[in-house]
Design a protein with these regions (language model features):
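Short S/T/G/P-rich N-terminal loop/turn motif that feeds into the first structured element of a domain
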Residues: 27-31, 59-146, 177, 216-225
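A structural signal for short secondary-structure junctions
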Residues: 152-153, 163-167, 197-198
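Short, conserved secondary-structure transition motifs
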Residues: 12, 53-68, 206-216
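Short amphipathic alpha-helical segments
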Residues: 1-4, 40, 131-154, 190
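The feature marks the first
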Residues: 1-37
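An amphipathic, aromatic/His-enriched active-site/gating alpha helix that lines ligand/cofactor pockets
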Residues: 29-54, 85-91, 151, 177-206, ...
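Short, solvent-exposed loop/turn elements at beta->coil junctions and helix N-caps
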Residues: 9-13, 158-163
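Short, well-ordered beta-strand segments in beta-rich or mixed alpha/beta enzyme
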Residues: 14-28, 114-119, 165-189
Length: 225
């Protein structure tokens, strides 16, 4: 499964909250289900007990391009949600999808450590992320992104959307060769507006990568290097 032609899987030895964490990247839900079924057929599955899971799809933040597109359409006098408006948006999405295909279908980074956590945006009576104008959401997310870009050389981030699929709205996967980077990055991001005011975080899961060839060593109490 680690090198499946239909996608990739990665195994991590977890710290604190469990023993194993498996990450599956596939291009369809059917393929994800097949990965589940294949895992259940392994002899190892007799010794596994599911304690947590998360289902989501890779999602790209397109606030800047969306704001520009909406502004252009309004300036042309095109009515929001009209057939002309919808066609323009669909055409733009198709172009962006092709241009961003490597980001939509990434490889699982080869980094030694992973940190995963789910998150929501506040939507209460006092603070509601979804009631903000898109221009304001764009401003805050741009500020948020500036922090992440400062860590671009040391951590790989993959954001997934899970509204309608799981209990939280997004999943965040961080990959790095130094686990302390996770703490530094997340701590620094706590101070930007979108995190300090609108973010809600779930449990954090941290693990050490285990190649398939190292599973026997792990079961014998030796962490593969």
């Amino acid at each position: 499964m680690e090198h499946d032609v239909k996608g990739q899987s990665a195994l991590f030895s977890m710290l604190a909250k469990g023993d194993l964490l498996l990450v599956h990247f596939r291009s369809s839900f059917d393929q994800l289900k097949q990965a589940e079924l294949e895992l259940a057929r392994l002899r190892l599955s007799d010794f596994l007990e599911l304690t947590s899971s998360y289902l989501s799809v890779i999602e790209l933040g397109l606030y800047e391009s969306s704001v520009k597109l909406f502004r252009t359409l309004r300036e042309k006098g095109i009515e929001p949600h009209s057939s002309e408006w919808n066609t323009a948006i669909e055409d733009t999405i198709k172009r962006q999808t092709e241009a961003m295909r490597p980001r939509l279908f990434p490889q699982i980074p080869a980094s030694r450590y992973i940190c995963f956590y789910p998150m929501d945006r506040r939507r209460g009576e006092d603070k509601n992320w979804y009631s903000l104008p898109i221009e304001e959401r764009q401003r805050q997310m741009e500020e948020h992104g500036l922090v992440g870009r400062r860590y671009a050389g040391t951590v790989k981030q993959i954001i997934t959307g899970s509204i309608g699929f799981d209990d939280w709205e997004w999943g965040v996967d961080l990959f790095a060769d130094d686990p302390l980077i996770f703490k530094k990055l997340i701590y620094e991001m706590r101070f930007d507006e979108v995190s300090a005011v609108y973010a809600l975080f779930g449990k954090f899961f941290v693990g050490v990568r285990v190649p398939a060839t190292g599973l026997e060593d792990l079961c014998n109490g030796k962490l593969p290097q």
